[in-house]
Amino acid sequence: MAPAKATNVVRLLLGSTALWLSQLGSGTVAASKSVTAHLAAKWPETPLLLEASEFMAEESNEKFWQFLETVQELAIYKQTESDYSYYNLILKKAGQFLDNLHINLLKFAFSIRAYSPAIQMFQQIAADEPPPDGCNAFVVIHKKHTCKINEIKKLLKKAASRTRPYLFKGDHKFPTNKENLPVVILYAEMGTRTFSAFHKVLSEKAQNEEILYVLRHYIQKPSSRKMYLSGYGVELAIKSTEYKALDDTQVKTVTNTTVEDETETNEVQGFLFGKLKEIYSDLRDNLTAFQKYLIESNKQMMPLKVWELQDLSFQAASQIMSAPVYDSIKLMKDISQNFPIKARSLTRIAVNQHMREEIKENQKDLQVRFKIQPGDARLFINGLRVDMDVYDAFSILDMLKLEGKMMNGLRNLGINGEDMSKFLKLNSHIWEYTYVLDIRHSSIMWINDLENDDLYITWPTSCQKLLKPVFPGSVPSIRRNFHNLVLFIDPAQEYTLDFIKLADVFYSHEVPLRIGFVFILNTDDEVDGANDAGVALWRAFNYIAEEFDISEAFISIVHMYQKVKKDQNILTVDNVKSVLQNTFPHANIWDILGIHSKYDEERKAGASFYKMTGLGPLPQALYNGEPFKHEEMNIKELKMAVLQRMMDASVYLQREVFLGTLNDRTNAIDFLMDRNNVVPRINTLILRTNQQYLNLISTSVTADVEDFSTFFFLDSQDKSAVIAKNMYYLTQDDESIISAVTLWIIADFDKPSGRKLLFNALKHMKTSVHSRLGIIYNPTSKINEENTAISRGILAAFLTQKNMFLRSFLGQLAKEEIATAIYSGDKIKTFLIEGMDKNAFEKKYNTVGVNIFRTHQLFCQDVLKLRPGEMGIVSNGRFLGPLDEDFYAEDFYLLEKITFSNLGEKIKGIVENMGINANNMSDFIMKVDALMSSVPKRASRYDVTFLRENHSVIKTNPQENDMFFNVIAIVDPLTREAQKMAQLLVVLGKIINMKIKLFMNCRGRLSEAPLESFYRFVLEPELMSGANDVSSLGPVAKFLDIPESPLLILNMITPEGWLVETVHSNCDLDNIHLKDTEKTVTAEYELEYLLLEGQCFDKVTEQPPRGLQFTLGTKNKPAVVDTIVMAHHGYFQLKANPGAWILRLHQGKSEDIYQIVGHEGTDSQADLEDIIVVLNSFKSKILKVKVKKETDKIKEDILTDEDEKTKGLWDSIKSFTVSLHKENKKEKDVLNIFSVASGHLYERFLRIMMLSVLRNTKTPVKFWLLKNYLSPTFKEVIPHMAKEYGFRYELVQYRWPRWLRQQTERQRIIWGYKILFLDVLFPLAVDKIIFVDADQIVRHDLKELRDFDLDGAPYGYTPFCDSRREMDGYRFWKTGYWASHLLRRKYHISALYVVDLKKFRRIGAGDRLRSQYQALSQDPNSLSNLDQDLPNNMIYQVAIKSLPQDWLWCETWCDDESKQRAKTIDLCNNPKTKESKLKAAARIVPEWVEYDAEIRQLLDHLENKKQDTILTHDEL
């Protein structure tokens, strides 16, 4: 259509529409109402500059301090520049150290305030010092404070005599090689003048190695601004109005809050209004009016017919697929997030049949390959799965940073496109192995052989027998050496007696275990069996074995140890002689034991083998080559540990037989010892998992290794790159070969230790097929030509000689006699070998200079943190050092094997097919290995592809000539996952360059609405305020143009580990009715706590210690919060905020009976008495704690009937300060009442219920109210009510555990809280708790119910009434499942119940209920009334005591006659009349109206008082 014609059409359309709208009246296009929700942190806004520094610290400590140097006084500009300018200034400074991708990631980190908790953590640590008054910055020097720079010197003088401070893993330590220095901790705000002044002095002292300088962020005057968060979802769900739940005391919401007048999408019913307004700017007003009209007409929410629902998912996909590709994801976001008002228009979309067919084909393929069902959602970034249920914005940031690091490194090596994905798929896995020693060694004396000894001749030999069932705890007896125990012992030590006894037990009971000994004996040839028991035993053993057999020799050894005196426990020569004389009377004792014995062969072999293995102190034991842990070497522990490993190995062997990799032709020992994790030597330095890798990749370094002055100013990465670029190698051949392993040895080769390391490396190189060897010089003393004679000889040889001669000459220089001769004055040329290019060598030797040694020494000092002369090794970029002991040829072999098996072999395989120059291939492998291995282990990558992509896959291409992330998304556009994923994909598209494929994984034949809520995912690629000059409230969920008729409920969907609460709202967020509001509904939430979760197990029993209590606090407040350990998974949770916390056992029984013996996920070393837990992130923190009982408390149990003598403060799953009184001990005569409520109406009911309880008892009452869903108004009023009526209360709080199946509907979540967490919601001091529904009115003293005898049941419920006959048709429990399940038992109502918590915990009722819930909740149609269906379903596993019927009366089910006996009245819903509860309450319970009026009077009084306070304040 021609432009002129199009313009005329639009004008005609708008003209007629405007006329029509004017006739309909202005009300049609009135400003629409909206709902907004914010979430703020509990702490104030933190400075972006400090957050940027934490981002840098994650990159490296070096980058942190480099960034710090450039921004020392940057905060000064904050006073003069706008937020926008200052924000850009920070990004500009950061840009000096980051590439474009990481700048985008920094912006994203700012947006989600990812590093704010780290700043707040330091703020909390500073508060715990505490800071001196009036100081902008201060230092702490071994417990002494000052904010004066000139006092630092004085405080340092006696610092060593004071306690050294604890340093956290997240502390920023100024780079230095020395750790054992006085620690000076600076608390200051980076970027301020005060900080700069302190930093100048402290950094100078640190460089001079006078102090260890540590920086911790400290903001003396925190911002007054709230810090709004993002990375969470907000749902506006449509509520059922079957039973009216609105509070008629509410007034209409009047608010001046405004929301930007914008629509969430420019597209409305096919019109792209954004583009239309650009083209026809003169018609903007008319277009806006037309747009609003279409929106209003679009908001009709008439229910859809069943036949209209069936194809909705495909119809949504058709509309999305037909949109322009770059608008399609935004359209999916609009449709999914606003589905209730989009559903009607979707029914008019014709389904593209090509798309439908293609979707079904792809779904079949995905189902087969990945088990992805129609409707399932998956997101993959570079093949890594992003679990939408678990991953949050903070985890995604971490993932993108790690991926970006690898991708940048590969790009700098010239790798792009598909080649890059090959390398990304590599995963460093070898370090997960448990390494085992090769036990095929002649030094092991095997006392039995299952395969050849007659003792086992009747046993079956076939591996198939492994598949046959055996008794639990037993191992199949098969005539194969599948189980092997090796004991390393010194026969003349006290411990040996127990080990001989253990071997005898296994041998004599015919346990299917081959047993071997390695005897570590005196190796002095002058020592014989006449005066050394060990040597005597060895010679006797060899004699008996030779004359008879090995088994006879072992039995004789057992007899020798049986003769050991009980008070000595150590073998003597006499014990050996006695057995020889008694058992072998014809033997000549001195021929066997004496100095000329012929039975002394291989005496030294055991000691030699033991030394070669690298095992720790004796005794040692191996099972199939795997060493036992130190704590398992106790003889009782060892016996059980051996049997357990045999059972574990049997399971492994069964699997291998089943898979066919193990059969009857397989040699058992070779099968076990040919696995990848079998090594010739255990070297903990090589095998440890906390490894340091060098970054050898640089894009811009041109410095020469001899250019010391330039090298001095390079950073660590560039220094490493220069060393790598200028390294010379000894290889297997002079031809160009590819070495998958590059070894650098670091030493002072002018010292004996350095030459020994060189000798062992050369020894390894003789047999190596994968390695090349480079040399790094680290001289001990000041460098000159005199003290580098050997090193210069090595260097000159590397620079001038071919490999064959180079290896031989280096071998010469490694000999001590030659080195001694050279230093005695002999010329080095004297020792040149035949075939060397002697002229070239001499010329280079005389001209080489010492600059290269200075460069190497600086590299060792700055990058490797080695002192002069210290030794180390680098293997494919992995640094091991400093070496404290000899590094043997076997160690080099082990290191090569592991490096090659880990990634070297795989990288080599890829590289060989890439056409890279052979000379560069070995360098390339080394650099890629160093890069990929430096990244923490990642999950497996999936290669997800689609059979066809023409009609069902949205594809967007990345920007050309730049690296890109490969993103695969699979989602049904009408699911909760699509609501979140759409916004995430939009944000990712602005952060990273990505190639995306989005597959429409639609479900067909829908029978109900797929979505029943509006949704917003609050996430942006960068800060909204600060990133532009427009003032903004910060991240916010905005629901614009929402229909006014439905009743809505607002839900926050936050990351795991967040506990949020509402702090302000201008209406009832459980019952939002926009018809009753003037304009905007606002909800303000606060992140109240970050959750600390954990698992706890008893180390001995490996069972959770049920009822164990932990406390979390600081050194000044040891017990701020506490919690109880569940039996289920040993799970516990504690509430905290950013900071450094101390985890302890609760004072009382927990501390008396148990001790903590191990922990993971904490910030402190395992041997530290205090367990330090640092919370410095929005991500979940999960701990693992091991405990064991004190020796004298083995038989004691926390959950016994004795009184709990606690001294700590119960406060873990409650608020910190809500209680008027805190009890430290059990109070017998108190009524503990538990209740839950959500929404203003039910809070009104709750207050009335509480008053009715109080009016009918003289016993002190304590209410336990679930805090999670209480409104700000209720929380504000409850303290006044408590004071007025004289009761106590706790607001209990618990986060639904992640491992327990989640509920999504508010009512069902609340039902879950009523029943699923009774064992952990309340302290152990509470014996009994009574649950009373909020809509109940009590007419009797509940003390009677508390004291009611439950006959041993853990809880008592009232059965449903049967007396109102007209309701028989509604009694669901009388028919179907419930009738058959209950038989003649009653179905109980959950409106009122009493729980004996001691009994409940003792029988594990909570865990039983949770397990059954987990099983039943898989079916969404089960547990329709969760809180009462679950206990009734479990009636046979967790008994219910039926309470007398009088305890609960409700009109729906009970006849009128029984009302007069009612002790409580419940306002049950009536499925027949659907009468609202408010009407029913006033009609059924006369006193309800009186209670209501009384409380209303109190609330009015409080409101008037509040208004008076505000007026007085304003006047002042």
Curated annotation (Swiss-Prot):
GO terms for biological process: endoplasmic reticulum mannose trimming; protein N-linked glycosylation via asparagine. It is found in: Endoplasmic reticulum lumen; Endoplasmic reticulum-Golgi intermediate compartment. One of its GO terms (cellular component) is endoplasmic reticulum-Golgi intermediate compartment. PROSITE patterns: ER_TARGET. Pfam families: Glyco_transf_24, Thioredoxin_12, Thioredoxin_13, Thioredoxin_14, Thioredoxin_15, UDP-g_GGTase. It comes from the Eukaryota. Interacts with METTL23. Interacts with SELENOF. This is UDP-glucose:glycoprotein glucosyltransferase 2. It comes from Homo sapiens.
